[in-house]
Regions:
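N-terminal beta-loop-helix "entrance" segment that forms/cooperates
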Residues: 43-56
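Histidine-anchored nucleotide/phosphate-binding helix
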Residues: 18-31, 37
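Extreme N-terminal starter segment of soluble prokaryotic enzymes
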Residues: 1-5
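Anion (oxyanion) recognition and catalysis
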Residues: 29-30, 79-80, 117-118
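Short, basic, glycine/proline-bearing loop/turn elements
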Residues: 8-11, 56-63, 94-100
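N-terminal glycine-rich phosphate/adenylate-binding segment common to multiple enzyme folds
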Residues: 84-129
C-alpha cells in the first residue's frame, strides 16, 4: 500500500479545506494506505483537547442531540486506526498557545515534513487560501 503525507494549515472551522483533508485521510486509510499529517500554522489547533460541540439552532437541537463532531474527535478516530501519524509544528504551537492536545499527535518541525515527503509516495500541501 502507499504512504501519503498531507500538510494542513487551516484552523478548525475556518473553511472546508480541513473537512476535505480529513475526508481524504479517512478514504486513504479505508483503502489500506498509511497517512502522515503535518499540522502547520493554525492547523495545530485541530487536535486541541478542550474543543466543545454546540447546539444546532437551525434544527433546534441541543448539544447532545446535535452530536457535533469536533476536529479533535475526528483526528482521534483517524489516529485510532493505527494508519495515521500526526505531527504538530512546535513553533506554531508555541506561537498560538495550542499545546493541550488529544493523545497521539507529537511535536515536530518543518524537517519532519521534509523527511515524510521524501519517504512518501505522494505529498499534498493544503494551504489556507
Amino acid at each position: 500500500m502507499a504512504k501519503l503525507t498531507i500538510a494542513l494549515m487551516d484552523s478548525p472551522y475556518e473553511s472546508g479545506t480541513t473537512t476535505t483533508a480529513m475526508r481524504i485521510v479517512d478514504a486513504a486509510v479505508r483503502k489500506g494506505h498509511s497517512v502522515n499529517v503535518f499540522a502547520y500554522e493554525g492547523a495545530v489547533s485541530l487536535t486541541m483537547k478542550e474543543q466543545k460541540g454546540h447546539p444546532n439552532p437551525v434544527k433546534g437541537t441541543t448539544i447532545e442531540e446535535a452530536k457535533h463532531p469536533t476536529t479533535a474527535n475526528f483526528v482521534a478516530g483517524l489516529l485510532a486506526t493505527g494508519k495515521v501519524e500526526w505531527i504538530n509544528c512546535g513553533m506554531c504551537v508555541d506561537e498560538r498557545g495550542s499545546g493541550d492536545w488529544i493523545e497521539g499527535p507529537r511535536r515536530g518541525g518543518p524537517g519532519d515534513l521534509l523527511k515524510w515527503s521524501e519517504e512518501s509516495d505522494n505529498t499534498l500541501i493544503m494551504g489556507t487560501r
